[in-house]
UniProtKB/Swiss-Prot annotation:
UniProt protein name: Uncharacterized protein T09B9.5
Compartments, record wording: Membrane
Chain residue ranges for the region called Disordered: 329-363
Native organism taxonomy: Eukaryota, Metazoa, Ecdysozoa, Nematoda, Chromadorea
TM helices/strands, residue ranges: 20-40, 63-83, 101-121, 141-161, 186-206, 227-247, 268-288
Sorted UniProt keywords: Membrane, Transmembrane, Transmembrane helix
One GO CC term, this protein: membrane
UniProt entry tagged with the keyword Secreted: no
Keyword NADP belongs to the record: no
Membrane topology: Multi-pass membrane protein
Amino acid sequence: MLTTPNPDLCVEPFIEPSQWFFTLVEMILAVGGLIMNTNITVICHKASPMPHPQRRLLASISINFAILSGFQLARNFFLFLVMQQPCLNQVTTVSCKLQQFPLIFCYIHCAASFFLLGVQSNFLKLKPIDKSPMKWYLSCSVWQSTIAAVCVALSLLFTAFDQDLENEPMNKCSILLAVSQSYLTFSLLTLLILLHATGLIFIMLASVLQRDKKSWISFTIFSLKEIFKYETLAWQISLFISGCVVLYRHVLRESCDECAVIVLELAFLIVPLLISFMHPLYLIWYVLPMRDAATRTFPCMLSALPEYSLVPPQVPSASTSATFAIQSPRADLTPNDTLHMESKKKPLSQSPRVVIEEEDVAE
């Protein structure tokens, strides 16, 4: 997309108000998502007493969202600069698929991680090592590397192996419109929908199995279930609308390309960026160990975050629902008092959290 003096290879820059608006919104969401997901990755490693495999997957999802935000930030910052140029190099279907390959990888890897987190929730057990922060060299396991390699292969299948016989020009790059074989596009959207939906089903099944247990695993599963419901709903809406646009354009060959690009910009790009922006906030708000780790890592958050003012999620029993009001012994302390208490290394034997951890390990 470099400036070129050849008018045959040039297209007029997009200067419509909608394009400026979308670019500005995506840049704001990308900056926020990049900063918060980078910080939440550090917090995930310190979120005891969550099991290490669960922390590892949550950190992997946060890294994925950080990469997605960084990619979108670079892309929109470049567009923001070149939109004022008198001539832009015309985008083709081949160059568009090359540009959007990292985006497809992030979407597939995110869906696969959500699916694995749902499956993993049915087999979690606390170990004594889970009470301590996770080492950085344990952040990536062999099977996580395998999943990433499979996601790269699937991304290549949906982009590089598309039989694009004609390198057609495009007004604006959109990966769903650049793939010439429509069944690949529908297969990609179907795969993402199924992975997110199946992951939610598995974590809801885990919450049913854990409903009678009063442990940190059950609290964490119920908290993650709330996050999964919101994020899966947003993903389903995004992917469903994107599929409708692709189907509309596939059925009606002479359709409004500008309308399709605008809808896909909103549904397929902005909504996932909004999810990546909200994901760290959901984790800190709903998951109690994440809140505790966040305030221990960044004590300044005690003044801004209503840490421990919320009780853990309700854990329904077979006949009724019960709320376990567990609060930190630091609930009424200021940040200075908290730091002073931690400097004295006061034992936490009276903390409700330690009692529950012992129950988990005893199980």
